[in-house]
Amino acid sequence: MENGNKALSIEQMYQKKSQLEHILLRPDSYIGSVEFTKELMWVYDNSQNRMVQKEISFVPGLYKIFDEILVNAADNKQRDKSMNTIKIDIDPERNMVSVWNNGQGIPVTMHKEQKMYVPTMIFGHLLTSSNYNDDEKKVTGGRNGYGAKLCNIFSTSFTVETATREYKKSFKQTWGNNMGKASDVQIKDFNGTDYTRITFSPDLAKFKMDRLDEDIVALMSRRAYDVAASSKGVSVFLNGNKLGVRNFKDYIDLHIKNTDDDSGPPIKIVHEVANERWEVACCPSDRGFQQVSFVNSIATYKGGRHVDHVVDNLIKQLLEVLKKKNKGGINIKPFQVRNHLWVFVNCLIENPTFDSQTKENMTLQQKGFGSKCTLSEKFINNMSKSGIVESVLAWAKFKAQNDIAKTGGRKSSKIKGIPKLEDANEAGGKNSIKCTLILTEGDSAKSLAVSGLGVIGRDLYGVFPLRGKLLNVREANFKQLSENAEINNLCKIIGLQYKKKYLTEDDLKTLRYGKVMIMTDQDQDGSHIKGLLINFIHTNWPELLRLPFLEEFITPIVKATKKNEELSFYSLPEFEEWKNDTANHHTYNIKYYKGLGTSTSKEAKEYFQDMDRHRILFKYDGSVDDESIVMAFSKKHIESRKVWLTNHMDEVKRRKELGLPERYLYTKGTKSITYADFINLELVLFSNADNERSIPSLVDGLKPGQRKVMFTCFKRNDKREVKVAQLSGSVAEMSAYHHGEVSLQMTIVNLAQNFVGANNINLLEPRGQFGTRLSGGKDCASARYIFTIMSPLTRLIYHPLDDPLLDYQVDDGQKIEPLWYLPIIPMVLVNGAEGIGTGWSTKISNYNPREIMKNLRKMINGQEPSVMHPWYKNFLGRMEYVSDGRYIQTGNIQILSGNRLEISELPVGVWTQNYKENVLEPLSNGTEKVKGIISEYREYHTDTTVRFVISFAPGEFERIHAEEGGFYRVFKLTTTLSTNQMHAFDQNNCLRRFPTAIDILKEYYKLRREYYARRRDFLVGQLTAQADRLSDQARFILEKCEKKLVVENKQRKAMCDELLKRGYRPDPVKEWQRRIKMEDAEQADEEDEEEEEAAPSVSSKAKKEKEVDPEKAFKKLTDVKKFDYLLGMSMWMLTEEKKNELLKQRDTKLSELESLRKKTPEMLWLDDLDALESKLNEVEEKERAEEQGINLKTAKALKGQKSASAKGRKVKSMGGGAGAGDVFPDPDGEPVEFKITEEIIKKMAAAAKVAQAAKEPKKPKEPKEPKVKKEPKGKQIKAEPDASGDEVDEFDAMVEGGSKTSPKAKKAVVKKEPGEKKPRQKKENGGGLKQSKIDFSKAKAKKSDDDVEEVTPRAERPGRRQASKKIDYSSLFSDEEEDGGNVGSDDDGNASDDDSPKRPAKRGREDESSGGAKKKAPPKKRRAVIESDDDDIEIDEDDDDDSDFNC
């Protein structure tokens, strides 16, 4: 052939080898490589007495032949459980290895078919094995019939010794020359203990070695430890020394020792013997995924499906833990958790398969394992506490920071893909530091700015509109930041880079814009947007605020014009000062600018022409600025924010008392302001307004949006029902509402809702589908299709006679709603309230209006009021007072025949549909962890009643019934309620905490009594003036008819003088009105009046008359006008009929006046209470009659259907009076009583104590009320409603207690609270609707009222703080635990007029309702857990987060 090579013959080219020759020729197919390999391996280090991982050089083939012998020895343990010893001797000097084990020996007998001894056959002949029967399930390492023969083949000497007592013989034979030669068999009699020994000398030449070096000996030694760990009950000796590894746990410790750092805590190992075939351990890994695993004593270095089986199960459960703790919102994937695990697995697998003879990777499918590894809940819990969760989250945070850094901007002359950006021509170029980016509040403001660019040019100025309020990035997580398009766009437009510091002006040159100018409305929400932008920059680039980088552009909020004179005012206090100093201010035309959109393009150009006046620089003034920004926006500074707001309210009150003007920022000479001044003088106004929107007034129980609705309804005084959509438009018009009408519609709907858990007294009547307890009001119809009208009770509560006494506000010259109305009972207790503002939140339960009236009568009579408990109209469950303002509430359960259960009431705030989906469905269908216990459940409820009839799977009824409190626990029908979070604004507009409902009642009583005195005085004056007027008119007519008085053909002055001479008075009614105005004006000077946001808010009459002196104004009236009430009468008045009518009217007024003078203010109040209670009885009686009438018709109709269907076919029934269509509870049912044990009370107190400590670590706790003695049951219950439209039905906090069946149904009761003397008796007049209460935490969303934004339609309302989340059913109590009321959750989304219970409003500007940053999902609540011997008590603890600044 070519190159002179001799051609090979056919015989030389195609050869046949024996199997022995093939093994020696191609060893890598059988034992792996025979070349030296460098790998990172675990080896045993004698000097350190532990496993070390290091790079060693070894021959895999040599290692494998040793391992085959060792695994054979370990396999013997599976054949003979009495085996307990393995002895391994490694002699590098003699190149000899020996493995000895006791236990059953190899049969020393002749094989009848092969005609040789069994040991000779299995060690000296290929393809022989005891593992060929696949029908036999074995958990040994041998499988293919090579094993020990391979060791024989690659050895120069291979000796087998075995002895068996069964055959009474011992065997010995030696092979040499790579199994090519065999010595004669030596057979001896034997009567000792069975054993087997293999001794071999590896053929080092085959492995290109000359001796057994240190690395291979270390690796072999490690395998000795492996076998000691993976072979239970076997002692392993190495070179005569017994190894100190007693079990798998000891073996793991040898590895962990190597990773412990003396300077830090030791690594926590979590170990578990899952079952007899699986033993698992795990710990955190900082080197990526690591595993040490064994299958039937075989070391699987590369892992395999047995490892995947364990790891996948572990990761799945750890991900659930991570989801709860992953506040960063990062999407953590399974492989990312895997990278933080170090797993140890020792398992026995039936007939395992591997990807090669080297057996490094187990490939058998999981279904063939013969067993499963199920990790216990304890193992998962311990793993979650081992540091693995923290490691994964820390890595996720680190990765998120790197990912966020990549999203930053860079300097470039042109950027694309950002809609609505008007980029400066020089942005990103050489003159970029001279460029200014104008950030506007919405598109309308952008139009204004673009108009201004016509004056200043577009080379150095760019404009970008914001879509609402920016995200509060200070506590934002990765997901929020990465998905927030607006923040990413800002970084790109400005060129900001995360993690970069901007310290000098040279650093500013790296940006696309050298300045940012904020241009927002001059209202409180505009201030909030400025603050959020400042916070955004301060959080990421605090050094940037120290440079002249940030500016604001201010515009007038009021303009006063007169002829050619135009005055601009940039704050309302400045405008008020000007009015006080300008006598002729009323001659000016006043125009209020509610937003930038009010200004015209011409005005925009005027603003930009006077840039020096309108541009204000933010100036850094040291650490006080940093501290102020952090205080305003950090979640950790809630208490500081409370102090900040309290100081602001005190300062406003003090300045009022001293007659000082309000402080304001923007004077005529203002060129710059500090960040601290902005926070303390401007942003504080938004925070205070946010509280006013979110927290009701103690006086009338209303929030501003609700008050605007009621003002409009009173003003319209409709006699016919009006469509809700039309009413909302009317509210916006009449009450100067400046935001979208959708939130008003929601407010109207919620004022009219009357299902269980909503209002105890609905002020508006629902005409149409306003929502039901089926879905908590979310099932209401569109505002276009439903109608409403004032309830007949409303004007009895908010009495028209009080209207003249109220202080009405003025907005843009328009008289709008008063600061507060003055109901005759405290409506804040009747209908309760919930809201989350800045620094504070409130939760006031509903109380029984009849109890409230009863207590008011007691107080009027000088007695102390009785303790009141929460009460919810038409709620049939029960509630018991425990201690410290906490109640335990339950639904109703009855046992029916046939071991069936009936649920006839749910906790307040638990809606029927949600309960079915979240509780009954899982109990019926089962979950991943728990099998279903219900075989069937049937529904018989309506929109107002609840009835589920439940059948159980075999044995489940008895099991649950035998458990104390079992039914209530399983069906999640018991929760707790706290009344320790009651905040409200008092009559002076100061935010206060009220420890109990009685404190609210007493505070209300003082004010209401004072105003009854004012009402009496007012009415006395009014009736006196009216009587005087009628008397003069009647006398005038008589004297005129009798010719005593002649007015014809006289001059006006002479005529008026004649009237005065004859004792006629100038118009008594006008004179009385003038006196009232003068008194109001004087009082306004002397007393501390309430503050107002937009215009003077003390009495409008007082303020206006203060500006125009009523005394002077009256004197200016001509005499004729003063006597117009006489001289202006028509000729018809001179008739006898009219004369008699006037006299009758006069006598009636005098009679009314006499009657009024005989009454005290207290008597007037009692009359009003009697009238209200009478009407309340009438209304509720009518409601009951209508409901019973409907139910009766329904029952009759369904009974007829049932009879008709029964004639034709057999109707399947669950028996025992639970017929189809029966909406009423079964009268034969046996009620299940819930028993509150001392243990439950102690657990509640302990859990509440921990929760309080977690919330307020530095604040002293409120004093606890004395313990309550248990009283006999039978009293009327009170319960708290959950009139939530968008509740999250949290069944994750349930009371575990005792329950037992009682022989009779018991009335709902409330346990006595300290101080109550007598049990309250149920009134016959309807006051005693059977009551109880359940509060599913977060389920009840009481009136959340805000005036600043528009809410999305009801269908899917985004939750601000508690967005819908997966319900956890594991805990014991669901209690807000809001002791001290210092939850302080500020919610930025809380700016809507939607007063639906716990339905947070969506934050957004009216004209940009579709924009804005995405809302953060309600953060999950922390849990305070008290560990006990029995169970854990868990209480949901409000996360003190300032949502107000966490958009």
From Swiss-Prot:
UniProt-annotated binding residues for Mg(2+) 2: 521, 523
Residue stretches making up the Toprim domain: 435-552
Pfam families for the chain: DNA_gyraseB, DNA_topoisoIV, HATPase_c, Toprim, TOPRIM_C
Assembly and interaction partners: Homodimer. Interacts with mod(mdg4). Interacts with barr. Interacts with ph-p. Interacts with mle; the interaction mediates association with the MSL dosage compensation complex.
Site positions per UniProt: Important for DNA bending: 836
Positions bearing Phosphoserine: 1284, 1344, 1374, 1385, 1392, 1396
GO biological process: chromosome condensation; DNA topological change; heterochromatin formation; male meiosis chromosome segregation; meiotic cell cycle; metaphase chromosome alignment; mitotic cell cycle; mitotic chromosome condensation
Ranges of biased composition (kind: Acidic residues): 1081-1094, 1283-1293, 1374-1394, 1427-1447
Location of this chain's protein in the cell: Nucleus; Chromosome; Cytoplasm
GO molecular function, one term: DNA topoisomerase type II (double strand cut, ATP-hydrolyzing) activity
Other comments on record: Eukaryotic topoisomerase I and II can relax both negative and positive supercoils, whereas prokaryotic enzymes relax only negative supercoils.
The name this protein goes by in its record: DNA topoisomerase 2
PTM statement from Swiss-Prot or TrEMBL: Phosphorylated. Phosphorylation by casein kinase II enhances ATPase activity.
Cited function: Control of topological states of DNA by transient breakage and subsequent rejoining of DNA strands. Topoisomerase II makes double-strand breaks. Essential during mitosis and meiosis for proper segregation of daughter chromosomes. During meiosis, it disrupts heterochromatic connections between achiasmate and chiasmate homologs after spindle assembly so that chromosomes can separate at prometaphase I. During mitosis, it functions in the separation of sister chromatids by establishing amphitelic kinetochore attachments in mitotic spindles.
Keywords recorded for this protein, A-Z: ATP-binding, Chromosome, Cytoplasm, DNA-binding, Isomerase, Magnesium, Metal-binding, Nucleotide-binding, Nucleus, Phosphoprotein, Topoisomerase
GO cellular component, one term: nucleus
Cofactor: binding details: Binds two Mg(2+) per subunit. The magnesium ions form salt bridges with both the protein and the DNA. Can also accept other divalent metal cations, such as Mn(2+) or Ca(2+).
Annotated site residues (Transition state stabilizer) in this chain: 784
Chain residues that bind ATP: 72, 101, 129-131, 142-149, 357-359
Record region (Disordered): 1079-1110, 1183-1231, 1246-1447
Biased composition (Basic residues): 1413-1423
List of residues binding Mg(2+) 1: 441, 521
Domain Topo IIA-type catalytic span(s) in chain numbering: 695-1169
Active-site residues from the entry: 785 (o-(5'-phospho-dna)-tyrosine intermediate)
